[in-house]
């Protein structure tokens, strides 16, 4: 099946973003916020990579953090902007590196239901290690790759509860715990918490889709993602 970009490029899909999260009982945003809450403080800055409509970062805003966000879709950024909580938003494709932020830009980084769009996460993890301050938290989700599962599969971009159609299908990727742990270690992060949860049911296989949430702390390690760029 031919697949498309994971970036939302039409106003209808963007307008349905929040509705689909409710329809599919998606609580990944709440999971990540709950796991990260003890490590953040009011007044801290948080950068949401793939902020979308702001479902995840608005929770951090309500806890007193200053939110910055990046997304490749103008349509969902417009929706996020209309909610009026973000201190700064940028349109940028996460595949285009380096990211448009200086080194040690923010206290914390989050990325929820985004990293499963990437087959190779290594370059992005290097960038995240560069822009986060030492002691900061990187909280994110990936889809857990279980034994016997293929790494990649097709799914609808927004209507995930329906079988994939060629005009709306995108490729998503699963990642094992060992792979994520290795990337975190290589980039100077200490793993603090993990939690597996059911994200939604994938209709093409009639199986539950399991995501795993991670919370890791950036350590002050020489040569671990601290190269000055941008």
Regions found by a protein language model. Give the residues of each.
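Short alpha-helix
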Residues: 171-188
């Amino acid at each position: 099946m031919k697949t498309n970009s994971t970036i939302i490029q039409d106003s209808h899909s963007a307008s349905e973003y929040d509705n689909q999260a409710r329809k599919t009982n998606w609580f990944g945003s709440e999971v990540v916020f709950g796991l990260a809450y003890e490590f953040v403080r009011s007044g801290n800055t948080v950068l949401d990579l793939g902020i979308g409509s702001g479902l995840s970062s608005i929770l951090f805003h309500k806890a007193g953090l200053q939110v910055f966000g990046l997304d490749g879709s103008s349509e969902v950024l417009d929706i996020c902007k209309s909610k009026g909580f973000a201190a700064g938003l940028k349109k940028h494709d996460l595949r285009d590196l380096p990211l448009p932020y200086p080194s040690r830009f923010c206290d914390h980084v989050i990325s929820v239901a985004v990293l499963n769009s990437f087959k190779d996460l290594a370059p992005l993890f290097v960038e995240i290690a560069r822009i986060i301050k030492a002691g900061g938290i990187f909280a994110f989700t990936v889809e857990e790759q279980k034994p016997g599962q293929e790494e990649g599969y097709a799914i609808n971009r927004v209507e995930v509860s329906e079988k994939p159609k060629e005009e709306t299908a995108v490729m998503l990727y699963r990642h094992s715990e060992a792979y994520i742990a290795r990337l975190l270690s290589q980039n100077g992060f200490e793993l603090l918490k993990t939690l597996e949860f059911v994200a939604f049911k994938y209709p093409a296989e009639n199986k539950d889709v399991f995501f795993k949430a991670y919370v890791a702390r950036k350590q002050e390690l020489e040569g671990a993602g601290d190269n000055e760029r941008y």
